[in-house]
A protein has these predicted regions:
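Catalytic metal-binding/acid-base residues of hydrolase active sites
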Residues: 195-196, 245, 287, 291-292, ...
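Bacterial Sec-dependent N-terminal signal peptides
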Residues: 1-19
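Aromatic/acidic polysaccharide-binding cleft in carbohydrate-active enzymes
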Residues: 317-410, 424-427
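Short acidic, glycine/proline-rich loop/turn micro-motifs
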Residues: 150-153, 201-205, 331-333
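Short glycine-rich, flexible loops that bind phosphorylated cofactors or substrates
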Residues: 90, 295, 373
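Glycoside hydrolase catalytic-domain groove-lining segments
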Residues: 115-117, 124, 235-239, 276-331
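Glycine-rich tight-turn/loop motif centered on a GG-T
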Residues: 163, 205-215
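Non-catalytic accessory regions flanking glycosidase/transglycosidase catalytic cores in CAZymes
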Residues: 18-191, 197, 217-255, 259-272, ...
Length: 500
């Protein structure tokens, strides 16, 4: 067997039965910022009603950086926590026209008075994130407070691009967001969510959640006013836009949403009337959601390469800020039906890989941290027996289930820490994807193996720590020196190599 060694801490090859991993720590790409998830919507119920032991278990799975006695991580160590700032639909009850109470959200503002005891269940997990050392928090709105909207509700009119907002209330809106951001000391604030969808009532006359569309002109105007308010009040929170509903709306200028597309150029080009790049309190970031663009592989890769190229030209970072399995994804995987196993985990890992490797995402977030739904939308699930759904049976207490998707995301989030740089890395093993990262103290590699099992010989002069998520493993730790690294079939593996 031909031996490969470190060459000035630049290049290493690990032989794998004729295959090899090669990487170069001097060829770097983006600097990683964070991995996150959101508290919608179940945390409102869980944090308020569930037994303390179960709330602590959820917090440990999501936030912990500790290991058990065998060296296996207790949690996935998220570095970003997304907190939904409610619009007041919960207080409206059925009059909100939002069908399910789980999807309604309280508001901190009643009249001119703030009640910081509202959204108490969500606050439990926001506090837990901070106590566990999560470095970044982000508050996001799906709708403006109902007292500031055109229709007095937290849902849209049903017309595309029609912002459900009374523009005479813009000062009250900036005051509200500034006060909430300052009170909770959010690192970031996202004022709009998936502006391309209509968020109106369905045929039943009711909607499924809070939300409003908005066109690029109005989004830029409102964001500029908010940015100025943050600057005037010395608010430390940074503004993040635009949470596009699909990634094509970031780059495409001839889409089916003509007043809501081409958002990278529109918001960050010096020649655009909607340019926000010069606002000191607006983060040089464009946020988008990976829904409906992940299958087939050719579309997943090509679109992300376009996003990465456009973001680089605009000199901004790209954040993938929300994803779960929706739709039928070209027949590859359907959103309906819970899957706690590796099929969904591997699909999600391929999406994470594409966003980071092809689009140069610096941040990647999942949608629902905890779900009660019979749907592929959670990292953790809460059910009472076979009773699935956002209902009274699961409202006050239920059994908890960790998914392989949780742990596969942890193969990234637990080890690819804020400030690490992505480096050049490749593997010749068929059906295996790889990304590499370094902080000069250690080098981290995440392998997404959708094919057969294989072995790699580790170099004798380095201890390699492996963490594997597979059918019978969840971030399971093994230390290897001068031995063979077993990469299981259908697995996600993280390799950590300490630099000398």
């Amino acid at each position: 067997m031909k031996k490969y060694a470190w060459i000035g801490l630049v290049l290493i090859c690990l032989h794998a039965q004729g295959q090899q991993i090669t990487f170069d720590i001097h060829k770097t790409y983006q600097t990683m910022h964070s991995f996150g998830a959101s508290d919608c919507w179940s945390m409102a119920m869980i944090g308020k009603y569930y037994p303390e032991s179960k709330k602590k278990q959820i917090a440990e799975w999501l936030f912990s950086l500790e290991t058990d006695t065998s060296g296996t991580p207790k949690g996935i160590g998220l570095s970003l926590w997304r907190f939904n700032i409610g619009a007041g639909s919960f207080e409206q009850g059925q009059a909100s026209k939002i069908t399910n109470e789980w999807r309604r959200a309280e508001s901190f503002l009643t009249g001119n008075t703030y009640d910081w005891e509202k959204q108490k269940g969500q606050q439990y997990f926001l506090d837990a994130a901070k106590k566990n050392g999560v470095p970044y928090t982000l508050g996001f709105l799906n709708s403006s407070p109902v007292q500031m909207t055109q229709n007095g509700l937290a849902i849209g009119s049903g017309k595309l691009a029609e912002w459900n907002f009374n523009k005479d209330k813009i000062d009250a809106w900036t005051d509200f967001i500034t006060n909430v951001s300052s009170h909770f000391q959010f690192t970031y604030l996202s004022p709009f969510n998936e502006p391309q969808w209509d968020w109106g009532p369905g045929k039943s006359g009711e909607a499924s959640q809070e939300g409003t569309p908005i066109n690029n002109v109005d989004l830029a105007w409102a964001t500029r006013r908010l940015a100025q308010k943050f600057q005037q009040t010395n608010t430390k929170t940074r503004i993040v836009i635009s949470e596009a509903g699909q990634l094509n709306y970031l780059v495409d200028t001839k889409s089916n949403r003509p007043s809501q597309d081409g958002q990278i150029d529109d918001f960050f080009s010096a020649n655009s009337l909607n340019n926000l790049g010069n606002e000191p309190t607006v983060e040089k970031v464009i946020a988008g959601h990976s829904y409906f663009t992940t299958s087939p592989t050719s579309r997943r890769v090509a679109l992300r390469q376009a996003v990465g190229k456009k973001a680089q030209e605009a000199q901004i970072n790209y954040w993938q800020s929300e994803f779960c399995i929706l739709g039928d994804n070209a027949g590859e995987i359907k959103g309906n039906g819970v899957d706690l196993g590796m099929k969904t985990a591997l699909y999600v890992a391929k999406v994470i890989h594409a966003d980071i490797h092809d689009a140069n995402a610096t941040s990647w977030s999942w949608w629902l941290a905890v779900s009660a739904n019979d749907f592929k939308d959670g990292l953790i699930y809460t059910f009472n027996g076979s009773n699935k759904g956002e209902n009274d049976a699961n409202k006050y207490d239920a059994d908890l289930y960790d998914s392989k998707t949780l742990w596969a995301m942890g193969n990234y989030s637990r080890f690819v820490r804020p400030g690490m740089k992505r480096i050049e890395a490749s593997i010749t093993q068929p059906d295996c994807l790889i990304t590499g990262f370094t902080d000069q103290k250690s080098n981290v590699f995440v392998l997404v193996n959708t094919g057969n099992a294989f072995e790699m010989n580790s170099p004798s002069q380095h201890v390699i720590k492996t963490y594997t998520t597979a059918e019978n493993q969840h971030l399971t730790f093994q230390s290897v020196r001068n031995g063979k690294i077993q990469v299981p079939a259908s697995s996600v593996m993280t390799l950590v190599i300490q630099s000398n």
